[in-house]
């Protein structure tokens, strides 16, 4: 399996590849959020139904603006989300009209996060946008916690593995509905 630095992984992503990369807690699988073919490939690899939707992880809040509909959130709701970022908080936000259903699934919202993980920030900076993020595992199995676990599940299936360390989070991010403030999953 090709092992690459974040800057080199950007080329794989821009070419429509699916990559694995370390995040705050587990390895993730990711691709270009503007490439439906790549998103379909990721969903097939993971054996995940498109209806569930996916998470976008960004290096900064500005990268999320083409994907979320801020007009459906009030100043308090936006300020609350931004007060938690960068960090291990994923917010469910209204989706911008016209966004691919492969990202939002069967919902009128999308899960988004601004990462504090240096490697993911570097990757997002290199591709100039957020990256699709879902845990590196087949649907229903435990997420990969090491490069070896990624290789065992995805050798010959994904385009590359980003070299780096997992962050210090013991569990995946907390998920909060930005409109209601309801915690959907404790991290």
UniProtKB/Swiss-Prot annotation:
GO cellular component labels: cytoplasm
InterPro entries attached to this UniProt entry: DHBP_synth_RibB-like_a/b_dom, Sua5-like_dom, TC-AMP_synthase, TC-AMP_synthase_SUA5
Residues of the YrdC-like domain: 3-187
Localization, UniProt: Cytoplasm
GO molecular function: ATP binding; double-stranded RNA binding; L-threonylcarbamoyladenylate synthase; tRNA binding
SUPFAM superfamilies (UniProt xref): YrdC/RibB
Catalyses which reaction(s): L-threonine + hydrogencarbonate + ATP = L-threonylcarbamoyladenylate + diphosphate + H2O
Enzyme Commission code: 2.7.7.87
Any Pfam family the entry gives: Sua5_yciO_yrdC
Superkingdom field: Bacteria
GO biological process annotation, one example: regulation of translational fidelity
Keyword terms: ATP-binding, Cytoplasm, Nucleotide-binding, Nucleotidyltransferase, Transferase, tRNA processing
PANTHER family: SUA5, THREONYLCARBAMOYL-AMP SYNTHASE
Family: Belongs to the SUA5 family. TsaC subfamily.
Function: Required for the formation of a threonylcarbamoyl group on adenosine at position 37 (t(6)A37) in tRNAs that read codons beginning with adenine. Catalyzes the conversion of L-threonine, HCO(3)(-)/CO(2) and ATP to give threonylcarbamoyl-AMP (TC-AMP) as the acyladenylate intermediate, with the release of diphosphate.
UniProt protein name: Threonylcarbamoyl-AMP synthase
Organism this protein belongs to: Shewanella pealeana (strain ATCC 700345 / ANG-SQ1)
Lineage: Bacteria, Pseudomonadati, Pseudomonadota, Gammaproteobacteria, Alteromonadales
